[in-house]
């Protein structure tokens, strides 16, 4: 079927590896391996592993600022990965190679201008991600970004940012989207390999518990509030330099995801963390979102 119509799992660095991606695809979604800052060898190993865990399509997210982006781009083509999502940069130079490998390319965009540019480059779809999302974010909310991107391009638009249940799923379609991508909800699943402390912090989070750090650096990041974000925001308000701020967050995501240090690490999560109330299986999450979403869409205004 149409890959955009599946619930897509966000390709989150350090979080989205073969186990999670395969579990999502096996559950009827589209699993994504997040290359993040990893090297090409790791990405290739994860692709090979995912293929042993699922016979369903899955994708890879490539951060184009990764020093090994060129090598990773070749790896996904070599293994005929079904879908590539991209962030932080322009995938134009890889398009021909990817198209020849039969890959569908879906860049993540945070503005109308970016969406138009990606369509011109030959993207098959775009993922319009609102500022509600976790990790690196743009400025515009999903609610206003999605319909504007839908109006601006002639390719399918996937909505992302703030979606965690069937209500968000249904709303995305009402805004003109052809599919949804969820990140935070999938981090808090049984099959996700992040540390239990990380999952617990997402489940415990309330509506106001995310903070955006790094606005002054031009690279804002949404995390769950903790000791690290408090220190960072204090330094930032005092006009601290880039070097000092970067030192604070260096290896922060690894600290939280792998070591489970959710006080001093970077617990990246979206505002939808407030909607996540339990840790369930990928299958349960996807089924629940689909069932609730379809009920709402068929009900209309009644």
Q: Where does each model-flagged region fall?
A:
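Conserved active-site-proximal phosphate/metal-binding subdomains
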Residues: 144-158, 164-302
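Short, small-residue-biased leader/transition segments that mark boundaries at the very start
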Residues: 1-4
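Glycine-rich nucleotide/cofactor/substrate-binding loop typically near the N-terminus or early
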Residues: 38-82, 229
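Glycine-rich, proline-tolerant flexible connector loops at the mouths of alpha/beta enzymes
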Residues: 31-43, 130-136
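N-terminal glycine-rich anion-binding loops that anchor highly charged ligand groups
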Residues: 10-28, 259-266
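Generic beta-sheet signal
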Residues: 34, 61, 108, 128-129, ...
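Alpha/beta enzyme core
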Residues: 15-26, 52, 66-157, 166-175, ...
């Amino acid at each position: 079927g149409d890959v955009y119509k599946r619930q897509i799992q966000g390709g989150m660095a350090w979080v989205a590896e073969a186990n999670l991606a395969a579990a999502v695809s096996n559950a009827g979604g589209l699993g994504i391996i997040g290359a993040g800052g990893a090297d090409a060898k790791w990405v290739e190993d994860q692709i090979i592993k995912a293929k042993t865990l699922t016979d369903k399509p899955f994708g890879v997210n490539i951060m184009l600022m990764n020093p090994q982006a060129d090598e990773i781009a070749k790896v996904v083509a070599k293994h005929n990965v079904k879908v590539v999502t991209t962030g932080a940069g322009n995938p134009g130079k890889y398009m021909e190679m990817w198209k020849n490998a039969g890959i569908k390319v879906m860049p993540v965009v945070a503005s109308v201008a970016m969406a138009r540019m990606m369509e011109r480059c030959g993207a098959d779809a775009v993922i319009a991600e609102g500022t509600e999302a976790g990790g690196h974010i743009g400025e515009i909310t999903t609610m206003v970004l999605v319909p504007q991107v839908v109006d601006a391009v002639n390719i399918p638009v996937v909505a992302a940012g703030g979606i965690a249940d069937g209500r968000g799923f249904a709303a995305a379609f009402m805004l003109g989207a052809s599919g949804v991508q969820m990140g935070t909800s999938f981090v808090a699943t049984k099959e996700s390999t992040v540390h239990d402390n990380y999952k617990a912090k997402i489940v415990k989070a309330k509506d106001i518990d995310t903070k955006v750090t790094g606005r002054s650096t031009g690279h804002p990041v949404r995390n769950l509030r903790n000791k690290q974000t408090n220190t960072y925001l204090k330094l930032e308000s005092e006009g601290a330099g880039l070097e000092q701020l970067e030192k604070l967050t260096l290896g922060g995501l690894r600290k939280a995801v792998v070591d489970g240090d959710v006080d001093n690490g970077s617990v990246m999560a979206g505002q939808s963390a407030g909607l996540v109330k339990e840790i369930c299986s990928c299958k349960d999450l996807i089924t629940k979102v689909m069932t609730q979403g379809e009920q709402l869409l068929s009900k209309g205004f009644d």
